[in-house]
């Protein structure tokens, strides 16, 4: 019986199993390669080469083959022989360092940015290689490391590092220095009864109308974006007092209809 993980990722796909440690398995594999456009592999570093099935061997069988490889840390560098999994890629790619709250440890991100993110980057590389093959008829070896994929997905934090000259701290749910720009509790106070509100400066007046406090536009504490940042604890408390009296979907509708970006924090059951 196939695992749930296997069926989730391989629905509507045909598959077969080959033992590549046997002569028959290698022979059948090479027959498939001869008729294939793309080979995707994520074996441990050097595994296919040790079996005699590396790129240099297979391109002699099929010169148009796109040989696509995923490795934890790529072919070169001090960690090229090291194995990797999702959390390792997140740790080494910088994602964990900017995830979590300032007073807590680096935090693992549950959406699989290391696994799925690397696969998406590789798919783009494969498509580019196929496009080039239309011109010269030749395949190529395309490689993406899990660390590199996570680094690319952390590009905003890397940009901010370059601008500030130091590593970016963890900010919890606060997005940059925009206030309001975080999660707020909602009624009835369940585990996921929260909304995320991101009211940009041009939306400030509309936001105040929604929460019924237009007079805050005249409050010096909140008159500018910089002032709102300096007084964010006071403003967040005001917003939370309003959201906590309302269902998260009610808050989302009210904000959305006023042109203020807002999302209800849905659990997996609500998403499905």
What positions do the PLM features span?
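Beta-strand segments within the central parallel beta-sheet cores of soluble alpha/beta enzyme folds
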Residues: 139-147, 254
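N-terminal helix-loop segment corresponding to the beta1-alpha1 unit
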Residues: 1-138, 170
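Short Gly/Pro-enriched turn/cap motifs at secondary-structure boundaries
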Residues: 6, 168-176, 198, 230
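Active-site-adjacent capping/gating segments
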Residues: 1-7, 177-178, 270-272
